[in-house]
Amino acid sequence: MGHRVLVYVGALFLILFTIFPSSSALISSPDANPPYPKAISDLKESIVKGLGFQSEEVKVSGFDIRDALVGHSVSYEFDLEIDNKVLPFKLLEDVNRWEYVDLPIFQVEQPSENGLVPMRNKKTSSDDVLPVLAPFQLSGPMELWIQDANNMRLSLPYDVDAGVLKKVILADGAVVTVKGARSVSLRHPIDLPLPLNQSSNEFASGLLSLAEQLRRASTDQESPVLSLRIVGPTSLASTSQSPDNKLKLKRLAPGLVELSSMSKDKRSLSTIGANAMTTVLTPREFTTMWPITSINGSNANLLGFEKLLTSVLGPKAQEKGSFKVLKAKVAAQTFMKIGFGIEKKLKEADVEGLSFPEWRTKPETMRMHFEVLAKVDGENVIPENVMRVDPIPLEDTIAQNVITGNVTMSKLPIIESPPSPFTL
């Protein structure tokens, strides 16, 4: 008897395990409804609110990270004060190439089978995907405040171990090449005199004259020296590899050094890019712009900035006076381009003002397609521009009987074409 009971109990457990093989089978597969990454989810909510929709009214589709395009560009931000009015400007270079890149913010942590999120031993670093500015040259006198550059290399032209640098003072005549910087910004506002001495349309002569006056003011002991903040540089190097043109290092304090030129009278020319040539404006004066001596007056961006400044100043550009630069920042940015769609149910009030033919069914839902250009800032994605797109153009096809009013061919008027000598 006891043996039969054990057989029945064993058979019952076998049936139960066959029907319910595991408790995890009651949990829906994560691949069936893949969750959005937190950055994309926050981006979706901010865009829906920015468009004026409520989350309950619309159905949002898209935002598939597999279709996201990633590109790098350079942004320019300026705040000018003219006649006690602050005018902010934000310019962005065109992205040359869009790619499918799996950024760290696109990754979603999936819970394990026991429902617990695995603990990460080390946070994934995104330094490998951070964009950097092209190498550029800076000339003294000025001071550089270094940020996020613990492993910065100092070459004068030979490598020098100066520890972790926080501040570098460039003496008059010292020129260094900065590589790997993520952004460069102005630390203090500066006053620039007017008028703009514009003499040629092929050169940014107005900005060059402003830069020259600013350089002369920086050499004055009574005027404050120009101060810049550089984020994330990987190296500061002498522009010349010759030992006769090397820079002299002077340690002033922990994290503070001064670089001065051994041959102050000699001008170091730009060596960035084999095709780059320095344009001579006069036999004795080069058109390189201080303090960024790696660009000259024929630079396309510099010409664009001068035209923008001239249009903003208006008649004041030719009058005596001054204006302030409160903020100036140049940064390498990562941008993302992704598409999405919004579907909204229409009410009677939404369709009343629209005229539809009698044969056409009035729409019940409205579908709109958008494309968003967003900036990747650390772990966040900030929308910059949302543009509506029409992926498929709509065309109305009307039957012939609808156009002719359902009239038979026998009742249509006979129209004879004019005779032609080539007709048989």
UniProtKB/Swiss-Prot annotation:
This is Protein TUNICAMYCIN INDUCED 1. It is found in: Endoplasmic reticulum. One of its GO terms (cellular component) is endoplasmic reticulum. It comes from the Eukaryota. PANTHER family: PROTEIN TUNICAMYCIN INDUCED 1 (PTHR34454:SF2), TUNICAMYCIN INDUCED PROTEIN (PTHR34454). Residues 1-25 form the signal peptide. Keywords: Endoplasmic reticulum, Glycoprotein, Signal, Unfolded protein response. The lineage of its organism: Eukaryota, Viridiplantae, Streptophyta, Embryophyta, Tracheophyta. Glycans are attached at N197, N296, N406. GO terms for biological process: endoplasmic reticulum unfolded protein response; pollen development; pollen wall assembly. The keyword NADP does not apply. It comes from Arabidopsis thaliana. Its main location: endoplasmic reticulum.
